[in-house]
Amino acid sequence: MLDQRLLRDNPELISRELGRRGMDVDLTGLQLIAKLQRDLEERRSGLQAEGNRIGKEVGQRIQAGADPKGAEVAELRLQGNQIKQKVAILEDEEKQLTAQLREELLSYPNLPSEACPDGRSEDDNKEVRRWGDPRVEDGLKEHWQIAEQLSLLDTERSVRIAQSRFVTLFGQGARLERALINFMLDLHTGKGYREVLPPVLVNSASLTGSGQLPKFAEESFRCADDDLWLTPTAEVPLTSLHRDEIIPSDQLPLRYVAYSPCFRREAGSYGRDTRGLIRLHQFNKVELYWFVHPEHSEEAHELITADAEAVLQALELPYRVLELCTGDLGFSAARTYDLEVWLAGAGAYREISSCSVCSDFQARRSSIRTKDGKTTRLVHTLNGSGLAIGRTMAALLENGQQPDGSVKLPQALVPYFGCDRLQPE
């Protein structure tokens, strides 16, 4: 959420930075609400100070010998009671304006980092680096073709069970999914991450804190009777782990890793990636999440990205790193690196992880602070996929396919899968 003080003191900066995202905003209405809220706050504070002064004066006069039931003291007490009534009215008005202002601000995205390159769309994203040698050969199959030939998944039965964009994994496919999850969790916990297994159902406050609500409600599945939602990413419950908390500065950074099923409606993606594992309503993902001191978030962004890259390197999967431009940033992000893995069958790079620094945007929405001595301030948060399991499996199938119909797996997976090949059954 945007800083209300910044809205009052420097609205031009907000307009300029949102303009870098391609937004043309008129903040006049928000500024008016913020000014009214600030004026009410000042009037209330002034009246409270006057009420405290009168209360103190009552005590002093009684101590000096005035009759506690006399007219002099009664008049002061009457003034004090009248002030209390006015304060109560102002508090109610102030709460209403504060809630209105918060509701309006919740719909605005984060301001981009100064380091984020300007641009209008994904065409303006900047390639940062590449790793590995992409396999380029004629006649390579796409992952869904390989998966069907090896009987790894069944989409027709999944439609019968649920609907389109769901898959059921069988045999080697189910084993490989489990192996990848365990491999990734072990890799990250070996680097000091604390493993978390969060709830799959989250409340509206959690989705609001991470930035999914109110703007993206149509993209998630909701259990309306209970005010619960199927989580679209473990980023949501991980953000709320410390909602409404003050984290001592000597405990930072906090680094969490979580496996969770993820659920997305994929609104607006009709006709795209209709086969295979790339775009599903339900998929598994291992998520990385950091809470850091504000002064260390840029450094942490490089580190969390490197941790996501380490998975691809261990699995011997070629990839490239893109820095997203301002016009392609996610709602909560101030700066983002996308990792795109090479899919040899498709002959293209596809996104497999987004690693974002969200500055204090999520922390302000979730009231997550840190305290260093007498100073209390909002933390910074970061998140990144480490990695999406289905897309990782797709990359392994396409890059490891062999002429005999088998798929060669990287050595790092052998202890988890039990052998180095997927064989036709």
UniProtKB/Swiss-Prot annotation:
It comes from the Bacteria. InterPro entries: aa-tRNA-synt_IIb, aa-tRNA-synth_II, aa-tRNA-synth_II/BPL/LPL, Ser-tRNA-ligase_type_1, Ser-tRNA-synth_1_N, SerRS_1_N_sf, SerRS_core, tRNA-bd_arm. Keywords: Aminoacyl-tRNA synthetase, ATP-binding, Cytoplasm, Ligase, Nucleotide-binding, Protein biosynthesis. Coiled coil: none annotated. Gene3D superfamilies: Bira Bifunctional Protein, Domain 2, Serine-tRNA synthetase, tRNA binding domain. The keyword Transmembrane does not apply. It catalyses: tRNA(Ser) + L-serine + ATP = L-seryl-tRNA(Ser) + AMP + diphosphate + H(+); tRNA(Sec) + L-serine + ATP = L-seryl-tRNA(Sec) + AMP + diphosphate + H(+). PANTHER family: SERINE--TRNA LIGASE, SERYL-TRNA SYNTHETASE. Consists of two distinct domains, a catalytic core and a N-terminal extension that is involved in tRNA binding. Catalyzes the attachment of serine to tRNA(Ser). Is also able to aminoacylate tRNA(Sec) with serine, to form the misacylated tRNA L-seryl-tRNA(Sec), which will be further converted into selenocysteinyl-tRNA(Sec). Homodimer. The tRNA molecule binds across the dimer. This is Serine--tRNA ligase. It comes from Synechococcus sp. (strain CC9311).
